[in-house]
Amino acid sequence: MNKYVLLGVTALIMAMVICVEANDGNSPSRKMEEVHRESKLMITKTTVSIICASTDYKQDCTTSLATVRSPDPRNLIRSAFDLAIISIRSGIDRGMIDLKSRADADMHTREALNTCRELMDDAIDDLRKTRDKFRGFLFTRLSDFVEDLCVWLSGSITYQQTCIDGFEGIDSEAAVMMERVMRKGQHLTSNGLAIAANLDKLLKAFRIPFPFLRSRRGRLGILGSGSSRDESVGSSQDSPPNEDSSDDSPSTVDSSENQPVDSSSENQSSDSSNNRPLDSSKNQQMESSEDTPKKSAFSGNQPLDDSSDKLPQKSTSSENQPLDSSENPPQKSTSSENRPLDPLRKLNPLNKLDSLKDRHLSEEGEFPPWVTPHSRRLLARRPRNNGIKANVVVAKDGSGKCKTIAQALAMVPMKNTKKFVIHIKEGVYKEKVEVTKKMLHVMFVGDGPTKTVITGDIAFLPDQVGTYRTASVAVNGDYFMAKDIGFENTAGAARHQAVALRVSADFAVFFNCHMNGYQDTLYVHTHRQFYRNCRVSGTIDFVFGDAKAVFQNCEFVIRRPMEHQQCIVTAQGRKDRRETTGIVIHNSRITGDASYLPVKAKNRAFLGRPWKEFSRTIIMNTEIDDVIDPEGWLKWNETFALNTLFYTEYRNRGRGSGQGRRVRWRGIKRISDRAAREFAPGNFLRGNTWIPQTRIPYNAN
């Protein structure tokens, strides 16, 4: 039934109640109570139907909200998030019981189950943040408010799926059992995302007024209804809610807001789990590789071939030249509306990719809006030039306060609200580093991405360690930054999944960093992430995950794989069609190192493949060398996600960018200039609200 018809029915019911009360005033109180109760139930049922109309799992939505005895749509929407939390907690508790005997008998199943418990806590945290922000229901820009809700709900979906994926290759029967007990929680979270994505329509349908907000001068003002995109710009940089909040029972709530549903023609996600194989080789058996490193493999930059392009082949590292340079005069920022979409018409930084280290990075430019002016100053300076005042210095030779990064992280105040700078001096640090969820506003500053290197060698083989646990460095604390650091995993191609860096933090920024490995080098796991002037190398799926990640002016280097393997740059893991996530490669370069070029005809390389049903990858204004196969994209299997994925290439250059022989799947899109702007950093990461005062050219489009 159309929602407006339902509203009419609701109004009619309310009118009937009023008439009964007016004309039957002398009736017994019991009769009046029954009429009230029945009318309230009918109104609640109608309201639930309207709320659930946009969801993919309507039966789960209506049956769960039927337990909430409130006709107020705001209470019902908040209860939808609460009920998802309860369902997830119930599911993981059930899973811990059902899998106990298997976990007791097998160490790897036990570790996967423990990882699941941790991930479910993270999924619940994101739902709590959503619920708490909805409870406050204060905003100056509806679209920014909904953006936060959708990012966190997308994160919750990803955490739940990561739990299930963790059993693949370890205990497939346990994976099936866990998927079964977690299914309802996944469905309710997906429904929550659908509700959030259509929140503006719900507010209008229920005629819920936008909230009163206090202006800067202290006067109260009310935001008018209508399109949220035309409202005054506000901040979406709210501090994280109290993580210790445990009020998860359905209760009363205020209202909230919305973001449009993804415009691509995508179908409803299936429940089947398609998990990433150990490698992409046609022959799946284990093979040795002469390229498996026997020590830290990244003491310097990998040589780049100079036969396939005309780009400079110098090092992209900046340790020998300071970023600050007074030679570059300030340049005025131009309006993003009047600026040409292709920044290369006026500026071609890609052809000078290796000279970016000479450009002056101002304290207020080039960074997303969550980067404070203080943090921008820190990113623009070099520690040895006394530009950064570190809270802690880490040095292997004992010249700092700490000898290990773990010791320095132990000094970060819990739920820190100010930037905590850790200067990591030159050296190779072989330690497993974790920035926990309670370590907020942490910043790593090194002496150069080839001089300060954090390394590890944990991999799936031979010990069957889950991909999530293989990371040399794991970043979970929000507002994390890293500058001039190298991250690597030296396990080698023969040991399959081996993550150098996993990022689950919201508002994470990486500048002039290297991420080096083979399979699964960089795990962009969840939330909003921005990479600038970075270098990522690997073989299979070496940028993967389900974050909302933008790579700007970065370099992606394909390395030599095992004998029968193919190389894939990206494997994006968007599972729900309404998730706002995706991988955007903007104004960058995709190339191969010297070891790969001799085998590129036999070991073909592709831009990406779909890890999950609604995988979304956008490559724009990027130099693509002839290391990429003319077909461009690789199937996961014969038919999986070919109709539901969203892959597009826009205004790229280079000998590997030709579209004539690209695959012709339904999910491969050709987009207009206007559509491309939605994926440019300014819009995709809300970068159009960045502070415009910059001394270097900046183009949000």
From Swiss-Prot:
Keywords: Aspartyl esterase, Cell wall, Cell wall biogenesis/degradation, Disulfide bond, Glycoprotein, Hydrolase, Secreted, Signal. Pathway: Glycan metabolism; pectin degradation; 2-dehydro-3-deoxy-D-gluconate from pectin: step 1/5. The record marks Q519 as: Transition state stabilizer. It catalyses: [(1->4)-alpha-D-galacturonosyl methyl ester](n) + n H2O = [(1->4)-alpha-D-galacturonosyl](n) + n methanol + n H(+). Disulfide bonds join C534-C554. Substrate binds at T467, Q497, R609, W611. It comes from the Eukaryota. It holds the Pfam family Pectinesterase. Residues 391-688 are annotated as: Pectinesterase 43. Glycans are attached at N267, N637. The keyword Transport does not apply. GO terms for biological process: cell wall modification; pectin catabolic process. Acts in the modification of cell walls via demethylesterification of cell wall pectin. In the N-terminal section; belongs to the PMEI family. PANTHER family: PECTINESTERASE. The PMEI region may act as an autoinhibitory domain and prevent untimely PME activity during transport. This is Putative pectinesterase/pectinesterase inhibitor 43. It comes from Arabidopsis thaliana. The gene is PME43.
